[in-house]
Amino acid sequence: AIGENYYTPKLLYIDKSCWEIALIALICAYDTPTVNTFLNNLGITDISDITISFQIDEERREMFKKHDALRWFNRVTPDGTININAKTLATTDTNPTSALAQKESKSKLVFQYLYLLSQPERKEGEPNRVQKLINSIDIKLKNVSFGDLSEGEKKLILIECITKVLGNNDSILLLDEPDAHTHIARKKDLLEAIETFEGQ
């Protein structure tokens, strides 16, 4: 995705650090009935009630100068605004430059953009990796932080995003104990999300 080129990784590693961007991707797919039902179960009935706050490193913006992800992020956060209404974020066009990216759903592109902009720090001696721009994300519903969600709820957000937004018929999912540390009431929801996935 760097240097104007669209790139979808053949292998995508998603762990618990991705749950915020997974929730944002689901919010961007709020008009999909199954996703809307899931958001309602989280207490989200109107995405306009959600505020998303980004903590960013301004000095690193230049590293992403000619990138679709940064151009979209700059439109979402005009004039350095870092507190954004979720409806604004969900309705801001992604405007991808490549024809291949234009075929992707907005929610998938938003996940990929935020994934790229918020990846872990580059380690010493690792070439060709860009330092992250977004240090942290806080999502609030009427001033109540989603950071207080249980581990099981965060895992369910990840599974829902993987199965409803990121995956397709050609995807193979490898899950490492997805129900570990999950309340018994959430295990059924996890199983249903996995079983309804159309990939493998």
Regions found by a protein language model. Give the residues of each.
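Conserved hydrophobic alpha-helix in the ABC-type ATPase nucleotide-binding domain
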Residues: 159, 189-194
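Active-site catalytic pocket residues across diverse enzymes, especially alpha/beta-hydrolases
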Residues: 163, 194, 198
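Conserved catalytic loops of ABC-family nucleotide-binding domains
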Residues: 168-169, 197-200
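Walker B catalytic acidic pair
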Residues: 176-179
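Extended helical coiled-coil dimerization/tether regions that scaffold
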Residues: 3-154, 160-172
